[in-house]
Amino acid sequence: ETEHQKRCTIAIDGKTIRGSENEKHKAFHVVSAFVAENQLTLGEVTVPEKTNEITAIPELLDLIDVEDGIVTLDAMGCQKKIVEKICQRKADYVLSLKGNQGDFHSDVELFFSEFANKYPKHTTTEKGHGRVETRGIRTLQ
């Protein structure tokens, strides 16, 4: 086994709890940390109304042990303070980046365009949840 294979992947994601809405409050929204290799939820926090996942993720990271793990987050979690918290907790990270970060997305695309033909790209396509998702990854050494 390589060192990477021994490390766990901790997927952090937000979910709205269906059926939890009533006349007194909106549906509950939670952020959970899930270890894919074990099919185990490490922790979960409720996202308070009038806030979002960005404020709940650091709170969740303080509650769970992510040391030496690889934390994955969608584009909502692509925030400096969240990355700082992950590093403080001694974990690595893989983040999604979309156009919701001003010029950051185009700056990253420009940076990686230099490597486009030097390293192979792996692409997957999945159909589900009423959409087709294509993901590409290129590993630089």
Region locations from a protein language model:
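Phosphate- and divalent-cation-binding pockets in alpha/beta enzyme and binding domains
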Residues: 81-82, 103
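Short hydrophobic alpha-helical runs that function as membrane-insertion/retention elements
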Residues: 92-97
